[in-house]
């Protein structure tokens, strides 16, 4: 029993040794060491990456907080004005000046344009249009029972808007636009037809139209940026608007224009100490509003594909980061602006920074260690290379006929079937030529098999040198060949077949030391365009059938259609 066990163990070790030879052992050891060194390096890289991402978010967060606080200050002012006007609308003051303004409105409301002003030093003027102008659209209306209260509340708003002005504000203009045909603005309007055009411009802006109860059921602050190019004499701006409602009735819209230039100056000041990275402010449609790049420097803008990738990420979270080519983009949604702030960090800035220096040192260490392993692996690489050469040689022998050096039957059918499927999907022509050497058996009988082999090799060489570069040819039987012509119509296949026939027929072969021989070939042609059938076996069978008829018709000829056969029979 022990002797039998020893034999079993020896057999098991031999099997293991055959499967895992010296080359495999060295390769396995190399891979294990390489794997562990790579894993350790990768762990350090991931830690470094997390630290880099956290650093980018911290830089972005500090600038975003400063910008958000400034925007919050402006939004609080807008809400304060709305609340003050709402209180004035619910409980209007019984001042004689306000009552007098209501009387003046009743007298002037039919005019094409009009103006009401209580005190030039303490309040803002009220501008309006006629009843006829208001009646042109259903968006506007003077049918409110609280029209007088709204008018006095707007005049009171003039006091608040003048008092609320501050040098710390980013706003260019604050205005209230009523659906009843009047407006109040911190920017004066020249008395005249400009009042009508300005009111029309206000009520046709998206920030006014989109504040209806149907389009803004939440009745909160909304931000708007114009999708159309700005005219040359008007600076680019964004608008925050807030509806005024009471008892489920929409009176008008309070709005605040913020110049993009003000946002740019504020953004540059906030990012002044951050020498790396560029900050960019986008609206809710990911249109670039402004950036912190110096005037002489071009901003790193995003292309359409990058914006689409960023939009998908923004939908998932309020902040994050994304690698876009050679840029790392960290982003954060602002709480008091319907948009997103980006920090774009380029690869050059990353390399020049602290994280770049650490990354370079870590990479060099890994490269040096890997180089040492690769040097020790050189001998095995040479062995593997020899194995590949042997494998390729065996593969060639498995796919080719050793005598003619063309594809054998199995390889030809496999490659031709794949080509036929591809050309069928592309709806391109596909043709097949079946070729047979005439009277080949008599060559073997008269001159021997060596002469027959010489004839086959000679014919294969002529076929290979005549067909196109992307055509394939193979030996499918004794003296029978098949030529696949992808992309060739039936007419083109006929031309190629004729060239092959002529070349074979024109060349003489030296079969013995003193004997030459001239051979000929018969061919049959089939094409997918005839019946719309791309099945290679069917095409080869049809070509073989026509080859048989070509031999019956006298040999050294080509048969390309069934119609030719019928004509020859008649």
Swiss-Prot record:
This is Probable diguanylate cyclase DgcQ. Residues 428-563 form the GGDEF domain. InterPro entries: CHASE7, Diguanylate_Cyclase, GGDEF_dom, Nucleotide_cyclase, Rev_trsase/Diguanyl_cyclase. Pfam families: CHASE7, GGDEF. Keywords: Cell inner membrane, Cell membrane, Cellulose biosynthesis, GTP-binding, Magnesium, Membrane, Metal-binding, Nucleotide-binding, Transferase, Transmembrane, Transmembrane helix. Catalyzes the synthesis of cyclic-di-GMP (c-di-GMP) via the condensation of 2 GTP molecules. Cyclic-di-GMP is a second messenger which controls cell surface-associated traits in bacteria. Involved in the regulation of cellulose production. Its main location: membrane. One of its GO terms (biological process) is cellulose biosynthetic process. Homodimer. Mg(2+) binds at residues 436, 479. NCBIfam families: GGDEF (TIGR00254), PRK15426.1 (NF011955). GO terms for cellular component: plasma membrane. Coiled coil: none annotated. Pathway: Glycan metabolism; bacterial cellulose biosynthesis; Purine metabolism; 3',5'-cyclic di-GMP biosynthesis. The chain crosses the membrane at residues 20-40, 360-380. Gene3D superfamilies: 3.30.70.270. It is found in: Cell inner membrane. GO terms for molecular function: diguanylate cyclase activity; GTP binding; metal ion binding. The gene is dgcQ. It comes from Salmonella paratyphi A (strain ATCC 9150 / SARB42). The record marks 441 as: Transition state stabilizer. Its EC number is 2.7.7.65.
């Amino acid at each position: 029993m022990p002797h039998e066990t020893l034999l079993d163990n020896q057999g098991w070790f031999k099997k293991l040794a055959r499967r895992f030879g010296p080359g495999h052992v060295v390769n396995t050891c190399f891979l294990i060491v390489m794997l562990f060194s790579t894993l350790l390096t990768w762990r350090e890289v991931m830690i470094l990456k997390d630290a880099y991402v956290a650093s980018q978010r911290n830089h972005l967060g500090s600038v975003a907080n400063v910008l958000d606080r400034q925007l919050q200050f402006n939004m609080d002012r807008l809400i304060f004005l709305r609340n003050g006007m709402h209180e004035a609308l619910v409980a209007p003051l019984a001042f004689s000046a306000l009552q007098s303004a209501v009387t003046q409105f009743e007298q002037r409301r039919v005019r094409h344009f009009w103006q009401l002003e209580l005190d030039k030093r303490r309040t803002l003027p009220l501008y309006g249009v006629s009843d006829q102008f208001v009646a042109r659209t259903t968006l506007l209306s003077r049918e409110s029972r609280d029209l007088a209260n709204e008018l006095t509340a707007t005049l009171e708003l003039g006091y608040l808007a003048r008092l609320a002005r501050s040098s710390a504000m980013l706003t260019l203009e604050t205005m209230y636009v009523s659906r009843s045909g009047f407006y109040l603005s911190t920017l004066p309007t020249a008395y005249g037809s400009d009042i009508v055009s300005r009111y029309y411009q206000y009520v046709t802006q998206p920030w006014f139209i989109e504040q209806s109860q149907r389009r803004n059921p939440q009745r909160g602050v909304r931000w708007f940026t114009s999708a159309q190019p700005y005219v040359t004499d008007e600076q680019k701006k964004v608008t925050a608007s807030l509806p005024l409602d009471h008892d489920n009735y929409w009176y008008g819209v309070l709005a605040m224009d913020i110049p993009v230039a003000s946002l740019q100056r504020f953004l540059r000041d906030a990012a002044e100490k951050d020498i790396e990275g560029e900050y960019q402010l986008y609206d809710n449609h990911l249109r670039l509003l402004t950036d912190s790049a110096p005037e002489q420097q071009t901003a790193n803008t995003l292309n359409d594909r990058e914006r689409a990738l960023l939009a998908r990420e923004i939908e998932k979270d309020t902040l994050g980061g994304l690698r876009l080519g050679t840029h790392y983009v960290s982003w954060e949604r602002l709480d008091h602006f319907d948009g997103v702030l980006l920090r774009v960090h380029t690869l050059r800035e990353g390399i020049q920074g602290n994280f770049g220096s650490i990354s370079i040192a870590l990479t060099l260490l890994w490269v040096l260690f890997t180089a040492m392993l690769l040097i020790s692996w050189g001998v095995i690489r040479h062995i593997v290379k020899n194995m590949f050469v042997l494998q390729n040689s065996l593969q060639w022998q498995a796919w080719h006929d050793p005598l003619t050096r063309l594809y054998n039957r199995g390889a030809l059918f496999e490659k031709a079937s794949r080509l036929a499927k591809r050309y069928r999907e592309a709806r391109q022509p596909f043709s097949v030529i079946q070729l047979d050497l005439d009277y080949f058996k008599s060559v073997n009988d008269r001159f021997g098999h060596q002469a027959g082999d010489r004839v086959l090799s000679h014919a294969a060489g002529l076929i290979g040198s005549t067909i196109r570069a992307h055509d394939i040819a193979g030996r499918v039987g004794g003296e029978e060949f098949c030529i696949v012509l992808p992309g060739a119509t039936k007419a083109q296949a006929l031309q190629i077949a004729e060239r092959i026939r002529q070349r074979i027929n024109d060349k003489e072969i030296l079969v013995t030391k003193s004997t030459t021989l001239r051979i000929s070939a018969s061919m049959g042609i089939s094409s997918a365009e005839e019946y719309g059938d791309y099945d290679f076996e069917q095409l080869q069978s049809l070509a073989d059938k026509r080859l048989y008829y070509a031999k019956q018709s006298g040999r050294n000829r080509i048969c390309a259609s069934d119609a030719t056969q019928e004509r020859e029979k008649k």
